[in-house]
From Swiss-Prot:
Family of the protein in this entry: Belongs to the conotoxin I2 superfamily.
Name of the protein: Conotoxin Im11.1
Keyword flag Nucleus: no
Propeptide position ranges: 61-64
Keywords from the UniProt entry: Amidation, Cleavage on pair of basic residues, Disulfide bond, Secreted, Signal, Toxin
Any GO MF annotation of the entry: toxin activity
Lineage, highest ranks first: Eukaryota, Metazoa, Spiralia, Lophotrochozoa, Mollusca
Length: 64
C-alpha cells in the first residue's frame, strides 16, 4: 500500500512540474506588454507591446 501511495505521489509531482515548464515557456500574444522580441509569439516587440508589424514614427508612405 505504501508503494502505491508513493508512486501516485511521484506521478502527480511529475505532472505538476511539466505543467510549470509549459506555462513558463508560453509566448505573449499581440497587444500584450513585452520587453524583448523573443517574448512575443511572432517575435515582434514594438514600443513595449507585441505587434505583428512595427510602425516607425516619422516615416510617411509615398504614393506614386
Amino acid at each position: 500500500m505504501m508503494f502505491r501511495l508513493t508512486s501516485v505521489s511521484c506521478f502527480l509531482l511529475v505532472i505538476a512540474c511539466l505543467n510549470l515548464v509549459v506555462l513558463t515557456n508560453a509566448c505573449l500574444r499581440d497587444g500584450q506588454s513585452c520587453g524583448y522580441d523573443s517574448d512575443c509569439c511572432r517575435y515582434s516587440c514594438c514600443w513595449g507591446y507585441c505587434d505583428l508589424t512595427c510602425l516607425i514614427n516619422g516615416k510617411r508612405a509615398t504614393f506614386q
